[in-house]
């Protein structure tokens, strides 16, 4: 049976024309809409372009002024650093030396593009908001020294200096561990009046020596723990029994050891009252087996005296992975994204500039290939580069850079404890 044919409805000419007209109108509307959209997009692009252009122009104008701050540096150091920031056409340079009692972290962050100071409590307070140091700058120095927020320029060092004759007389090498240093001290008792000495009356030397002993006994973790405690406490009693590591390292254990040293003949009975002239007198008279000081202070000792002493890193009983060299670092920070400041920071890290800086200050350069002032400065760079923790600030800079009265009080309490 055949299917019936489907009936097709005929469309009249009039209807067809109406449909074609409607379709044409729809096409016209679509084209118009597209043109409108295109016009709007072009407008947006134009506005964005204008905004970007205005921003670029404003930034260029803003970057023309480079504001540089110095804090806690000697006049000579400030002048040395200024020389490496060139006066260029259309660039306005503003230099400020911030006085000891006028440092305000918030104000400094908002006002300046660059800051030069010693790494420590102050730089830590600004680190979170600081700009990254350009990678090309960091690549000039050993990996362990690369700090992208606070880049080291020169290194000082908390050192032990050994009387070479005492080393020879005892038949011992420079100690590699703190246990070996204790053996040296005991062996030196029959050779010199005071196997150990330091300028204990000077607050910075006193607190730095305590820090070196904590690093020697408990390592970097214990050292950092002590820094945290000293920053929030103002008395010796508050930190005396805080456990600094997983073992038995406390400030009390360190001070008890020092309290016994004079009784054991290891140091002068009043070492904690020693001053610069005392150390110099004993060293010149060949009465010291070793002494603790900063490299920068070592440089002030006359050559005819210091030539008889061999500088070394403070020996430790911890693994290399838990150790940082206590080496105060003259450092630079970028506090804004000023493009000219980012250019200028690179000027401090050429091989020639680093060699010049080391010669002028007698401190250690950080550039891998720069010539150091002498073997002592070269050793400091090598030791810092070889430590897992790199160069770390001394306790003075880490906890008391802006708290001299609190430091004076604490050191007075330490002297009372060990006497």
Language-model segments: which ranges?
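Periplasmic solute-binding protein
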Residues: 142-176, 200-234, 326-333
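Glycine-centered hinge/linker elements that transmit conformational signals in sensory
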Residues: 224-272
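C-terminal capping/gating helix-and-loop segments adjacent to ligand/active sites or protein-protein/ligand interfaces
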Residues: 326, 355-419
């Amino acid at each position: 049976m055949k299917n019936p044919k489907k009936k097709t409805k005929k469309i009249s000419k009039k209807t067809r024309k109406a449909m074609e007209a409607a379709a044409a109108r729809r096409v016209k509307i679509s084209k118009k809409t597209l043109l409108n959209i295109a016009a709007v997009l072009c407008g947006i692009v134009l506005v964005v372009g204008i905004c970007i252009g205005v921003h670029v122009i404003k930034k260029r104008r803003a970057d023309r002024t480079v504001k540089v701050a110095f804090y806690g540096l000697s006049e000579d150091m400030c002048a040395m650093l200024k020389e490496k920031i060139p006066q260029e056409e259309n660039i306005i340079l503003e230099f400020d030396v911030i006085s000891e009692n006028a440092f305000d972290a918030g104000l400094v962050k908002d006002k300046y593009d660059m800051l030069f100071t010693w790494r420590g409590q102050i730089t830590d307070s600004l680190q979170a908001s600081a700009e990254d140091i350009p990678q090309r700058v960091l690549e000039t120095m050993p990996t362990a020294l690369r700090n992208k927020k606070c880049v080291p320029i020169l290194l000082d060092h908390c050192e032990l200096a050994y009387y070479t004759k005492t080393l020879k007389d005892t038949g011992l090498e420079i100690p590699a561990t703190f246990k070996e240093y204790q053996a040296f001290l005991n062996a030196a008792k029959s050779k010199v009046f005071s196997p150990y000495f330091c300028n204990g009356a000077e607050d910075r030397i006193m607190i730095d020596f305590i820090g070196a002993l904590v690093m020697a006994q408990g390592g970097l973790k214990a050292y950092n723990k002590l820094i945290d405690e000293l920053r929030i406490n103002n008395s010796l009693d508050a930190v005396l029994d805080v456990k600094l590591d997983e073992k038995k390292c406390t400030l009390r254990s360190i001070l008890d050891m020092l309290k016994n040293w004079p009784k054991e003949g290891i140091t002068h009975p009043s070492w904690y009252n020693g001053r610069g002239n005392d150390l110099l007198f004993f060293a010149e008279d060949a009465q010291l087996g070793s002494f603790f000081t900063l490299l920068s202070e070592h440089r002030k000792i006359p050559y005819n005296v210091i030539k008889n002493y061999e500088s070394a890193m403070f020996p430790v009983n911890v693994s290399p992975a838990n150790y940082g060299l206590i080496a105060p670092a003259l450092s630079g920070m970028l506090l804004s994204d000023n493009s000219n400041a980012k250019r200028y920071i690179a000027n401090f890290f050429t091989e020639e500039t680093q060699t010049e800086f080391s010669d002028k200050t007698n401190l250690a350069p950080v550039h891998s290939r720069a010539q150091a002032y002498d073997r002592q400065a070269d050793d400091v760079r090598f030791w810092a580069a070889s430590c897992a923790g790199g160069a770390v600030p001394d306790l003075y800079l880490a906890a008391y850079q802006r708290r001299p009265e609190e430091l004076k009080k604490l050191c007075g309490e330490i002297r009372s404890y060990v006497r």
